[in-house]
């Protein structure tokens, strides 16, 4: 901790010392706020992350975790939505925006971040639901994520017969881009790209 942030024995900042004016937030809470800004409000990922990292003085490990989590979730969003839809009774498109982003972040951790135990991804997602005034939906979040943990490795992806859907989900690319590539290069070359 920097010298100028020391507190005296009363718990108050020592006289004349600088204190950061930010409320402590978990890295996952910051990731959730970033995802809402990016996916729900249409803001640019790099600008959102830059703003968060400027505002909150995170340790290097937490900065790296935040950036990997947000950038990876944005990058794999189509695949994540497909997996969530397989294990949720409520389609991703009909979920509350905050719930949708909590699930996306957690499923990304389960599928792509080996250093995060599945149980931690689930528990932290439930905590995020509670922290963000979604207590009635914490059971829904927990249930979907437990199903993902149990079954995601056996998730049937769209068959290659449906070329566009197959490539879209497998590579997490919008269908319009896949269509354009297939029209221009054919299926095999598009898949190789």
What are these regions (language model features)?
Residues 1-193:
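Class I Rossmann-like S-adenosyl-L-methionine
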